[in-house]
């Protein structure tokens, strides 16, 4: 063989050892009389691989047939199928009967496959993902094979363990933690394991009885020895059991109940972090699935756990302290900008959000980072930089460990070691490699510091004002001094602020706080007081924020959120200062505090399509049959999006007309999803209606008609939904197809009831909307769901004029589009009929007078924006009158259901002068804007009598001209 052809490609410093290794290999081949014909791919990469890995060279020299076998079988040149290791190992273990034989087979198998994996990695034939995957599959195959053999042999000798409750045979469950659990095992990694068994009990079938704990402890010790003990054949995998409950001082194996009790009552923050990657890797997988379901809530809390940041920061500080103590600086795993920092970034989001966003319950860090970017929790550029750095660092780690199959993460200090690592990484020299490494680590460190940098909460490090504010909160200042400090901080009535703080400090909630919660509250308060002092009305804002704090203080994660994220605190103060309605909403539903983290999304109001996509995406994480969780998520979604609209509204980002639009879009999206859930529920219980044309609500023969503010795109905060339900069932239509069939009319009635239930039922997260169905034919005495023909007949023959007025603002909003189109055509037919103008004017005037007498609260120097003379209702009645009076000659007036566009239509048709139309539209907008502002301040829609005087006079004049003057058009 001509080995010399490629030696010159190595750095000169590495060539001497390589020449020596090649000579020894040649000698070993000749001694064994082995064929020395190697494939071109093997020869081309041999010098590269051996130059970078003494481990590969040594094993090829010791077992010269190994390389020939790997290339002859083709295994060296291809990735394995997922079950290759299991099948191959099973064949080799067929005839063994002792632990000694098992240990020999496993070690030789491991050495052979490790040579193959390292070769493919260093040669550039395997991606990092392939290396991770195959190393993890190799470990699992060895674990499962060893456990199966040992369990069989031990049960033959000591009997089979049985559960005392189930009476069934018991098997051990092995959890893989860390890199093994995440399927990210490195080239010379320990495997972190936890052993468990389902139930307590005793063995059967042997002379001596053992309890299950003793049985499985013996089995665990044998398994560890078979894998971990170093013999002349080497080892299989080093086993680390320190992640088990109570670590080295805890039992080697624990029952499921003991595991659950430990993590519920004693589990520490770092154990939550470790459990993220836990996975069943060997033993009884079915029982293991139950165990993982029991343990999942320990890592993934149902609420947003912002305390995780503080815990991970503490863990990182402990690691850094230990590295300093040992004098280690160049550790690519634990050092600054290293592998662990990338993992901490991803896993911090998992700990915080994973309970709410089950899609984040992934183990692999690259997948987690990608999901975080997709969900806008992490900027895309940050994801790209972190993923690139992680891949680079893991490749460095593999090359460090490939050299001698040693578990090391320290960069070499010797010249030869540095030359070898740079060469193995594909760089011309150490300086070029070190520069690339430093750039990756710098980027990781920047992202890590941005997320984990401790906020300036240490009172001793605060500027003077915050120190003094802390003393005010803690009660360390005399009253006069406290008043002076608060006054200097911007408070106009510091006495009132002192009373508010005293109320909170002495409240039962604060006195009952845990030590950790009290520390977090004490850190937060000086920052909070400073931020509130900078608002326009600090005392008012402080009262609102204090009420919220008292509500959430027991959930320390929220205190951590506000303390850890200055932006969240800033937005909270800003919104509470602007609107008591928003403050009240945040207090009732603290989960919304998460929305304060990112002002970009907080003030970014979504359109209809984006809302629908966002809701669909959110519901994908919930099982389709879990209606309770679906209802909860709908409420969270509605509250979150309403908060965004309100935040954009009070800060002037969103104009008034857009507020109504977006609140209407939100209601429509929720209506459609609620109808879909209702339809699925009915179909599941009673089967699909044979008369419906498909599986979805859009083909159901059921339509939801929106009236009033929903129909007119004018929903406000807390608006009811005025709904009418229609169906297209015909007499004689067959019942539904299920085991509990329903007549179509009954089916549709149940569908309407279920929809109202989903929208209106109060849950721990509140309700979605109040639903008003009184505008249906015959009102509360009529059927909840009407057939389209019956509805048409009612509108033609029985409906009052006020019901036709209401029809002006009616439109199809959800359900069967064909039925919706039929309703739209019918609406145009009804509204487009010619009416007696005198009778119409009289009936509209009479209804308006009746409403005003009952509802107008214009008294005592106040004007009712809605019902007062010249107010909102007068404009709405003018619009409705105009449509009913003129649409027969101007059908274009029926195109839109909202007042502004109808007024524009009046002007375009010459029915009103442009100035008159504009005057009404401007007054309508001004009234609604004022009512909306008052709503945000939780005030009634009334203003001082002197406001809007010109607008009111103008509206009344137009009212008189159109509806009082007998010569009106």
Curated annotation (Swiss-Prot):
Taxon lineage: Bacteria, Pseudomonadati, Pseudomonadota, Gammaproteobacteria, Chromatiales
Enzyme Commission numbers on file: 2.7.7.89, 2.7.7.42
SUPFAM superfamilies registered for this protein in UniProt: Nucleotidyltransferase (SSF81301), Nucleotidyltransferase substrate binding subunit/domain (SSF81593)
Family from the record: Belongs to the GlnE family.
Keyword RNA-binding included in the entry's annotation: no
Keyword ATP-binding in record: yes
GO molecular function list: [glutamate-ammonia-ligase] adenylyltransferase activity; [glutamine synthetase]-adenylyl-L-tyrosine phosphorylase activity; ATP binding; magnesium ion binding
Reaction catalysed by this enzyme: [glutamine synthetase]-O(4)-(5'-adenylyl)-L-tyrosine + phosphate = [glutamine synthetase]-L-tyrosine + ADP; [glutamine synthetase]-L-tyrosine + ATP = [glutamine synthetase]-O(4)-(5'-adenylyl)-L-tyrosine + diphosphate
GO cellular component assignments: cytosol
Keywords assigned: ATP-binding, Magnesium, Multifunctional enzyme, Nucleotide-binding, Nucleotidyltransferase, Transferase
GO biological process entries: regulation of glutamine family amino acid metabolic process
Top-level taxon in the UniProt lineage: Bacteria
The organism of origin for this protein: Nitrosococcus oceani (strain ATCC 19707 / BCRC 17464 / JCM 30415 / NCIMB 11848 / C-107)
Function: Involved in the regulation of glutamine synthetase GlnA, a key enzyme in the process to assimilate ammonia. When cellular nitrogen levels are high, the C-terminal adenylyl transferase (AT) inactivates GlnA by covalent transfer of an adenylyl group from ATP to specific tyrosine residue of GlnA, thus reducing its activity. Conversely, when nitrogen levels are low, the N-terminal adenylyl removase (AR) activates GlnA by removing the adenylyl group by phosphorolysis, increasing its activity.
Cofactor: Mg(2+)
Positions of region (Adenylyl transferase): 466-969
Pfam families named among the record's database cross-references: GlnD_UR_UTase, GlnE
Region described as Adenylyl removase: spans on this chain: 1-456
Record-given protein name: Bifunctional glutamine synthetase adenylyltransferase/adenylyl-removing enzyme
Signal peptide: none
Gene this protein is translated from: glnE
């Amino acid at each position: 063989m001509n080995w010399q052809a490629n030696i010159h490609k190595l750095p000169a410093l590495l060539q001497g050892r390589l020449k020596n290794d090649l000579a020894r290999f040649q000698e070993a081949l000749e001694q064994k009389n082995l064929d020395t014909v190697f494939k071109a791919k093997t020869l081309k990469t041999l010098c590269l691989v051996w130059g970078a890995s003494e481990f590969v060279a040594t094993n090829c020299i010791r077992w010269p047939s190994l390389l020939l076998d790997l290339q002859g079988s083709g295994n060296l040149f291809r990735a394995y199928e997922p079950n290759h290791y299991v099948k191959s190992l099973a064949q080799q273990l067929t005839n063994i009967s002792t632990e000694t034989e098992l240990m020999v087979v496993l070690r030789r198998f491991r050495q052979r496959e490790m040579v193959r994996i390292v070769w493919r990695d260093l040669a550039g034939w395997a991606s990092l993902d392939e290396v991770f995957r195959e190393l993890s599959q190799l470990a699992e195959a060895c674990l499962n094979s060893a456990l199966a053999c040992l369990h069989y042999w031990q049960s033959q000798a000591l009997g089979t363990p049985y559960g005392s409750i189930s009476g069934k045979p018991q098997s051990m469950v092995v959890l893989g933690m860390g890199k093994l659990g995440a399927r990210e095992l490195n080239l010379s990694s320990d495997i972190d394991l936890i052993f468990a068994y389902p139930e307590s009990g005793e063995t059967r079938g042997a002379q001596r009885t053992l309890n299950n704990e003793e049985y499985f402890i013996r089995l665990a010790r044998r398994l560890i020895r078979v894998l971990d003990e170093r013999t002349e054949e080497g080892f299989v995998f080093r086993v680390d059991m320190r992640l088990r409950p109570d670590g080295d001082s805890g039992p080697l194996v624990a029952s499921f109940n003991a595991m659950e009790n430990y993590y519920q009552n004693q589990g520490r923050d770092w154990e939550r972090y470790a459990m993220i990657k836990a996975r069943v890797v060997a033993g009884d997988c079915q029982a293991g699935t139950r165990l993982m379901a029991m343990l999942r809530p320990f890592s993934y809390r149902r609420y947003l756990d912002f305390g995780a940041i503080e815990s991970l920061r503490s863990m990182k500080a402990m690691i850094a302290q230990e590295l300093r103590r040992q004098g280690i600086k160049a550790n690519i795993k634990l050092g600054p900008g290293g592998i662990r920092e990338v993992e901490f970034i991803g896993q911090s989001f998992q700990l915080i959000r994973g309970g709410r966003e089950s899609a984040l319950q992934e183990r692999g860090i690259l997948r987690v980072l990608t999901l975080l970017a997709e969900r806008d929790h992490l900027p895309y550029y940050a994801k790209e930089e972190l993923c690139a750095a992680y891949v680079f660092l893991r490749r460095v780690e593999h090359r460090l460990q490939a050299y001698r199959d040693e578990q090391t993460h320290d960069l070499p200090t010797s010249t030869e070691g540095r030359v070898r690592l740079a060469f193995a990484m594909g760089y011309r020299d150490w300086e070029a490699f070190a520069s690339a490494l430093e750039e990756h680590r710098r980027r990781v460190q920047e992202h890590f510091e941005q997320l984990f940098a401790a906020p300036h909460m240490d009172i001793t490090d605060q500027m003077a004002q915050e120190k003094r504010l802390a003393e005010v909160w803690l009660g360390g200042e005399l009253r006069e001094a406290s008043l002076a400090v608060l006054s200097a901080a911007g408070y106009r009535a510091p006495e009132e602020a002192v009373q508010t703080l005293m109320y909170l400090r002495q409240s039962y909630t604060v006195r009952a706080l845990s030590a950790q919660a009290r520390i977090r509250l004490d850190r937060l308060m000086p920052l909070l007081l400073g931020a509130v002092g900078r608002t326009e009305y600090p005392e008012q804002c402080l009262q609102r924020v204090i009420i919220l704090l008292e509500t959430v203080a027991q959930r320390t994660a929220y205190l951590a959120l506000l303390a850890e994220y200055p932006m969240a605190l800033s937005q909270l103060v800003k919104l509470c200062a602007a609107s008591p309605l928003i403050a009240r909403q945040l207090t009732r539903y603290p989960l919304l505090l998460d929305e304060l983290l990112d002002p970009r999304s907080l003030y970014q109001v979504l359109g209809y399509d984006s809302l629908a996509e966002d809701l669909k995406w959110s519901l994908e994480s919930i099982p389709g049959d879990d209606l309770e969780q679906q209802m909860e998520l709908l409420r969270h979604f509605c509250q979150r999006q309403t908060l965004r609209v309100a935040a954009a509204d009070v800060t002037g980002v969103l104009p008034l007309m857009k507020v109504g639009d977006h609140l209407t879009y939100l209601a429509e999206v929720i209506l459609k999803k609620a109808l879909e859930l209702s339809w699925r529920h009915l179909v599941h219980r009673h089967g699909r209606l044979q008369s419906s044309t498909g599986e979805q609500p859009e083909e159901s023969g059921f339509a939801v008609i929106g009236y009033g503010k929903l129909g007119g795109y004018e929903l406000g905060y807390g608006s009811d939904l005025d709904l009418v339900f229609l169906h297209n069932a015909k007499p004689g239509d067959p019942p539904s197809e299920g085991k509990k069939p329903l007549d179509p009319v009954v089916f549709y009635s149940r569908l309407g009831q279920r929809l109202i239930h989903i929208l209106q039922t109060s849950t721990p997260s509140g309700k979605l909307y109040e639903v008003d169905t009184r505008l249906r034919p015959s009102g509360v005495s009529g059927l909840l769901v009407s057939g389209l023909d019956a509805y048409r007949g009612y509108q033609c023959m029985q409906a009052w004029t006020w019901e036709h007025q209401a029809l002006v603002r009616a439109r199809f909003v959800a359900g069967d589009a064909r039925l919706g189109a039929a309703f739209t055509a019918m609406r145009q037919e009804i509204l487009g009929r010619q009416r007696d103008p005198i009778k119409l004017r009289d009936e509209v005037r009479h209804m308006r007078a009746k409403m005003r007498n009952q509802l107008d609260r214009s008294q005592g120097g106040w004007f009712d924006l809605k019902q007062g003379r010249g107010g909102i209702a007068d404009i709405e009645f003018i619009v409705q009158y105009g449509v009913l009076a003129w649409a027969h000659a101007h059908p274009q007036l029926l195109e839109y259901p909202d007042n502004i566009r109808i007024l524009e239509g009046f002007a375009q048709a010459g029915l009103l002068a442009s100035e008159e139309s504009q005057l009404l539209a401007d007054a309508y907008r001004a009234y609604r804007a004022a009512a909306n502002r008052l709503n945000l301040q939780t005030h009634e829609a009334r203003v001082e009598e002197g406001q809007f005087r010109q607008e009111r006079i103008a509206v009344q004049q137009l009212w008189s001209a159109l509806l009082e003057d007998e010569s009106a058009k």
